[in-house]
Amino acid sequence: MFIKRKLKETEIKDFTLNFGPQHPAAHGVLRLILELNGETIKNADPHIGLLHRGTEKLIENRNYLQALPYFDRLDYVSMMVQEHAYSLAVERLYGINIPQRAQWIRVLFSEITRILNHLLAIGCHSMDVGAMTPLLWGFEEREKLMEFYERVSGARMHASYIRPGGVAQDLPSGFVEDVYSFILDFSVRLDEIEELLTNNRIWKQRLVNVGIVTAKQAIQNGFSGVLLRSTGIPWDLRRSQPYEIYDKVPFRIPVGTRGDCYDRYLIRMQEMRQSLRIMMACLKYLPGGSIKSDDKKFVPPLRWEMKNSMESVIHHFKYFTEGFKVPAGQTYAAVEAPKGEMGVFLISDGSNQPFRCKIKAPGFFHLQNLPEMTKHHMIADVVTIIGTQDIVFGEVDR
């Protein structure tokens, strides 16, 4: 009798739910084990590694040029920015400076990549929350940007355009004019997206005061990029530790006040506007001259040289098969990627292959704080929080 009464009075509310890895809002292969009390989250345990490919080890068995395409495939939404980080690391180890024109072109494409990333982030996030139109508009604009990729590299995504020593090839005829036209048109499209979302009552109810991160938490967890700036800390490597020609272009660093999902959305919208300013400056001040270093051992020979010189043909063959040797040493190069600080720690033993290449991906640090960000929120808020973290598992798992 006693046992029956005990069972009758006991009510079990807590249960465990698997979120992903096949969930459309998981942004890849994220598996979350959620401990729920009704619809309230008590704990979220992220399981990663489902996209692990051993990238860092693969790079150690390739020469410095052959390692470059692996960086396109880490965060496969922010391709050229990662090429940029790797190229800077190799150039610092080698002790070489690249021409001004190549630096301006690199910055131009870094900002094109930033817009590519943020359009996808906001579009997919809005789709997860329930707004469909921004995703369709965003993909329409991304097509135009991918066409710019295609015109300089032949590829829409994995470009391998920013290379150690400069860039692969010069801008084609009419390219500057087309980018200028895009900047003018895209400003209007940004206004339209903001008109749909920024003051939308449902959008704000889903984002405001959801997934709050304090400045102290952000620093303790190694946050960078939009998630760090949403807490009110104006840390941007383009301004804090300028590389290439970022100290010569005017732009502002948008920061948040609450550190919630809505702040992160607003910052991404403002960052796209600042990217347009930087792109306009690149078009205005783009100098003439060479797009590659003049160090013949570090860059391949030009096409016209190979048509006139057998030595150039031999050099071309050896360059792409054996690569170049980099002096022994170590360096760390970081760039402000759309998701945060993308860093490459490179150790050379004096051979033509990296002895060690450690990649610092911002998404890995952001994801480790997901349990704290989701605690005591509703299960529907998990989608909102993951969306504003802007996670891509190519860089998290590597």
UniProtKB/Swiss-Prot annotation:
Reaction catalysed by this enzyme: a ubiquinone + NADH + 5 H(+)(in) = a ubiquinol + NAD(+) + 4 H(+)(out)
The protein's Enzyme Commission number: 7.1.1.2
InterPro entries, sorted: NADH_Q_OxRdtase_suD, NADH_UbQ_OxRdtase_49kDa_CS, NDH1_su_D/H, NiFe-Hase_large
Organism: Cafeteria roenbergensis
Protein name: NADH-ubiquinone oxidoreductase 49 kDa subunit
A GO cellular-component term linked to this record: mitochondrion
Name of the encoding gene: NAD7
Pfam family, one: Complex1_49kDa
Gene Ontology terms: biological process: mitochondrial electron transport, NADH to ubiquinone
Coiled-coil residues: none
Electron transport recorded as keyword: yes
UniProt cross-references to HAMAP family, sorted A to Z: NDH1_NuoD
Localization in the cell: Mitochondrion
